[in-house]
Amino acid sequence: MSGGLFIDGKWRAGQGAGLSSTDPATGEDVWSAATATPADVADAVAAARKAFPAWADRPREERIAILRRYKDILVERAAPYAEALSRETGKALWETRAELASMAGKVDLSIRAYDERTGVTENAMPFGRAVLRHRAHGVMAVLGPFNFPGHLPNGHIVPALLAGDTVVFKPSEETPLAGQLMVEALEAAGAPAGVVNLVQGGRETGQALIAQDIDGLLFTGSAAAGTYFRRYFADRPDVILALELGGNNPLVVWNADDAPEAVAALIVQSAFITTGQRCSCARRLIVPDDASGAAIIEATVALAERLVIGAWNAENEPFMGPLISGRAAKAAREVASATPGKTILALDGVAGLGDAFLKPGIVDVTGLETPDEELFAPLLQVRRVSSFDEALAAANATRYGLSAGLISNESELWDKFLSRIRAGVVNWNRPTTGAAGSMPFGGLGASGNHRPSAYYAADYCAYPVASFEASMVVDTLKDIKGLKA
């Protein structure tokens, strides 16, 4: 399958170098086309700028109608779209089907969030009324990730379009097909020319996009990239930044030793789902330094060894697929080999499968200092501590603050954990990856910039306008103090 750019309502070939994506399970080609040059990107932004006034002025009900048609198209095309996402990312079909369902569900959630958080409110005043309205920013640049190449950019694009913004979307260079399919669906839904534009490419294309006259950058990706964007836009305070970055997420288990298998299931789902390629995956497991902690580790190892690893279309449905590429797997193994500690499960390759496949890894780092970095791979560090206070301190010993979890049967410990932990998503007896479109999703510190996405995406897609209004000119001369006679 091949594709290109979508600019001002037309598909066209890029003028840059070639770009291709491959199935990480097999290495087979999935998509190929030419990338966007800076001139192509400038055309896309100009088209979005030209389309903005009419789109923002369009009645809200008409924008909603287009987005609901988009939702219907996603539902109609769910089966082939899910297969395409699986081919490009390597994720199991059960996971990409869930991703498509989340994309479709985002439309109605965004409408509800828009009304609740950025709608119109009115209060009577002695002179008339005070009205709070919200206005679209303008042209939003959306940079998408590879791990959820549909769901995560969709979570920016849908609320932006609903608010009246126009969009220039650059998918990850690893997953260009996913971005193309999303834009094809929006085109089929009737999005007017210039309202949604697609440019393909890598870092150079992204750099060309942020250098343009944009009004906002909506980004999901690494903390390093987020730091770069903060610095880049330091002299452009007019550009709104919504940054959803990574995490070095802790999962604490305390006083839950009566059900080690159930605990292990939560740990495995936290650490190894999506082959560890979720920003909310647990990277650090903190347990008591006693027999109960040992039992939890033993049960987790036993369950991890039972996980089915395979291609997305394997007859025996896998829990874990490959990483996004062989390069990513090689880099992860290098980091794992440099991590201090005692290896419990090695982050090894999988016999009979390609070089992008890895087994889940577990390493005991008790008493050791480890780099405070996010490793986007199925590697879990275990730390044993002697008290719950020490567990809390270890959990908070990170510059990140995306997700955290407590597994415990004691509500008193949960109350303490909830009040002390520093993260934007804090779960109790649920995986750290547990999230919902009806709730905000975002983090603190190196994990974001206090503009959570999901239900709160409405907040950064429109700005508030406070108006004090009288329907006719009223004599306020008497209100002026200190007038000369």
UniProtKB/Swiss-Prot annotation:
Enzyme class: oxidoreductase
Keyword Oxidoreductase: yes
UniProt-listed InterPro entries: Ald_DH/histidinol_DH (IPR016161), Ald_DH_C (IPR016163), Ald_DH_CS_CYS (IPR016160), Ald_DH_CS_GLU (IPR029510), Ald_DH_N (IPR016162), Aldehyde_DH_dom (IPR015590), SuccinylGlu_semiald_DH_AstD (IPR017649)
Active site: 244, 279
Catalytic activity of the protein: N-succinyl-L-glutamate 5-semialdehyde + NAD(+) + H2O = N-succinyl-L-glutamate + NADH + 2 H(+)
Residues bound to NAD(+): 221-226
An individual GO BP term: arginine catabolic process to succinate
Protein name, entry field: N-succinylglutamate 5-semialdehyde dehydrogenase 2
Organism: Caulobacter vibrioides (strain ATCC 19089 / CIP 103742 / CB 15)
